[in-house]
Amino acid sequence: MAACSRGLVARPFDLTARGAAHWPCPAPRRRAIRCCCRAQQEPRRRLSKAAAAAPERTEEWRIDGNKPAAAARGRRRASLTAMPSLPFPSPRSRRQWKQQNFYPRCTPRGPAPQSRDTPPKRDTGIASEKEWGINLLDEAVKESGTNEDGSTWYRESGDDRGDNGYRCRWARMGGQSHDGTTEWKETWWEKSDWTGYKELGAEKSGKNGAGDSWWEKWKEVLYQDEWSNLARIERSAEKQAKSGAENAGWYEKWWEKYDAKGWTEKGAHKYGRLNEQSWWERWGEHYDGRGFVLKWTDKWAETDLGTKWGDKWEEKFFAGIGSRQGETWHVSPGGDRWSRTWGEEHFGNGKVHKYGKSTTGESWDLVVDEETYYEAEPHYGWADVVGDSTQLLSIQPVERPPGVYPTIDFSASSPAPPSDDPPGMPPSPLE
């Protein structure tokens, strides 16, 4: 859908199994692997047979609801052919729009603003500043108009001021068809104050004549931690889309946090539904900047008939010593449960203790000679996020008068991390 002199034109909205992507494949977040032991050969990760069942391996899960969960020994697959596919590509977003397309629509007294109303892309992580193309005006604007086909549009901008040097520059635009069935909205903003806080953000939403709706919010923040005095940059994104033709939709929440000493935290919560099938995924990464790393993934799915299945794993390492563990499980509509658990203990001396068992009687417990590999540092860290946040860093706060100092509330903590509760489908902002 685009707002122009000819009006609003809706674009297709595809949430069918054919239009969805493949699930459950984990996000290929590893771009570089660092060896933390004596080995000097080209790093590569080795997994035990049990670890191979963890969600690090790209595979297709299939469930046959007619078969009992406690299947034959070693069974690791079941099938559900209607399950939509959900790829997990790199967190670096691959959006189709370009920055230069946005600037003309915020020119005062220019043509009607052009809508960027396509639904957000799934599993594209957090977009960059350049992909959003936020361009705020230095003057207040309030305009509206009607196109030849009866569709309407509006555009406005402003500059709000507050206590403690608070400043918020913003721009808002949108439009709708003559009958109101098609609509789009978009807002940009930048915030700052005398404490050094800076924020750049955007939010957009839309709906079409078929009843499909979508919403997306993006934000990046720079602030100084009151207790450590370290600079921090945090980026986040929330995305949602719903189908108007069937019981289908998805929701994602992504976040990344960095500080100047290498502390890094990343994670995502995801939820999707296609008619009688639902699926969830949560994953997280934590680096303390001194060598400790924690990573985990938890994925599960279910059908309205009662079939459920999932896979989860976790790894912790420091100075070449650590552990990995995980579980794959399945519950049939009748309540029969099958599971396989596995674990690894890495001692840092070339010895690895591997163990595991399953509800079908499998078990193993042995010590093997094996090198230990893991990522001790994030592939995208503080230096990278600073280099990609030039627009955020260039935000100019209101000039502080001599002798006036910012008020800092030490009782307030840094923004709370996202809840561990499974994400659901929040209501559309357009409803």
Swiss-Prot record:
<protein>
    <recommendedName>
        <fullName>Protein EARLY STARVATION 1, chloroplastic</fullName>
    </recommendedName>
</protein>
<keyword id="KW-0150">Chloroplast</keyword>
<dbReference type="GO" id="GO:0009958">
    <property type="term" value="P:positive gravitropism"/>
</dbReference>
<dbReference type="GO" id="GO:0048316">
    <property type="term" value="P:seed development"/>
</dbReference>
<dbReference type="GO" id="GO:0009570">
    <property type="term" value="C:chloroplast stroma"/>
</dbReference>
<feature type="region of interest" description="Disordered">
    <location>
        <begin position="403"/>
        <end position="431"/>
    </location>
</feature>
<dbReference type="GO" id="GO:0032948">
    <property type="term" value="P:regulation of alpha-glucan metabolic process"/>
</dbReference>
<dbReference type="GO" id="GO:2001070">
    <property type="term" value="F:starch binding"/>
</dbReference>
<dbReference type="GO" id="GO:2000904">
    <property type="term" value="P:regulation of starch metabolic process"/>
</dbReference>
<dbReference type="GO" id="GO:0062052">
    <property type="term" value="P:starch granule initiation"/>
</dbReference>
<dbReference type="GO" id="GO:0009959">
    <property type="term" value="P:negative gravitropism"/>
</dbReference>
<dbReference type="GO" id="GO:0043036">
    <property type="term" value="C:starch grain"/>
</dbReference>
<keyword id="KW-0809">Transit peptide</keyword>
<comment type="similarity">
    <text>Belongs to the ESV1 family.</text>
</comment>
<keyword id="KW-0934">Plastid</keyword>
<dbReference type="InterPro" id="IPR052495">
    <property type="entry name" value="Alpha-glucan_binding_chloro"/>
</dbReference>
<comment type="function">
    <text>Binds preferentially to highly ordered alpha-glucans, such as starch and crystalline maltodextrins. Involved in the organization of the starch granule matrix, thus influencing starch turnover by modulating the accessibility of starch polymers to modifying and degrading enzymes. Required for the control of starch degradation in leaves and starch distribution in nonphotosynthetic parts. Promotes gravitropic responses, negative in shoots but positive in roots, by facilitating starch granules (statoliths) formation in hypocotyls and roots columella.</text>
</comment>
<feature type="transit peptide" description="Chloroplast">
    <location>
        <begin position="1"/>
        <end position="19"/>
    </location>
</feature>
<feature type="compositionally biased region" description="Pro residues">
    <location>
        <begin position="415"/>
        <end position="431"/>
    </location>
</feature>
<feature type="region of interest" description="Disordered">
    <location>
        <begin position="65"/>
        <end position="126"/>
    </location>
</feature>
